[in-house]
A protein has these predicted regions:
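Active-site-adjacent helical/loop segments in soluble small-molecule enzymes
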Residues: 1-70
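Phosphate-binding loop/pocket of nucleotide- and phosphate-handling active sites
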Residues: 50-105
Length: 105
C-alpha cells in the first residue's frame, strides 16, 4: 500500500481522511436513488468518494473552506469510480437496513 500511496500523493491535489459514517452514508445514498438515477450497490470502499462529496455538499455551511479549495460550484461535474461492489452482504445490510455507522445527531 505504501508504494501506491506515493503515486497517489504525487498526483493528487486534495485528499480526505473520513469517518466510517461518511462512507456508510455513501453506501446508503447510492443504494437508494432519487427519481431516474440508477441504483448502485457498493461496499464502503467503493462508496467512500461519493460519501465524501455528499458530506461536503449536504453540509455546505460546515465545509465552505473545503468546497472553495476544491473549486466546487453549481457548474461542477463530479465523476466517481466505484471500486467495490457488495463484497460483504451482511455488513451491507447492517449499513442500509439497520443504520450501522450512522452519524449521531
Amino acid at each position: 500500500c505504501s508504494v501506491g500511496w506515493k503515486e497517489i500523493r504525487a498526483a493528487a491535489s486534495h485528499y480526505f481522511r473520513i469517518e466510517e459514517s461518511v462512507a456508510a452514508d455513501g453506501v446508503r445514498v447510492l443504494s437508494s436513488p432519487l427519481e431516474n438515477d440508477p441504483r448502485v450497490l457498493s461496499g464502503e470502499s467503493g462508496a467512500a468518494g461519493f460519501g465524501t462529496a455528499f458530506e461536503l455538499l449536504f453540509h455546505k455551511a460546515q465545509y465552505q473552506e473545503e468546497i472553495s479549495s476544491l473549486g466546487l460550484n453549481s457548474e461542477s461535474v463530479l465523476l466517481f469510480f466505484n471500486t467495490e461492489g457488495v463484497t460483504d452482504r451482511k455488513n451491507f445490510l447492517k449499513i442500509v437496513w439497520e443504520g450501522a455507522f450512522a452519524e449521531k445527531v
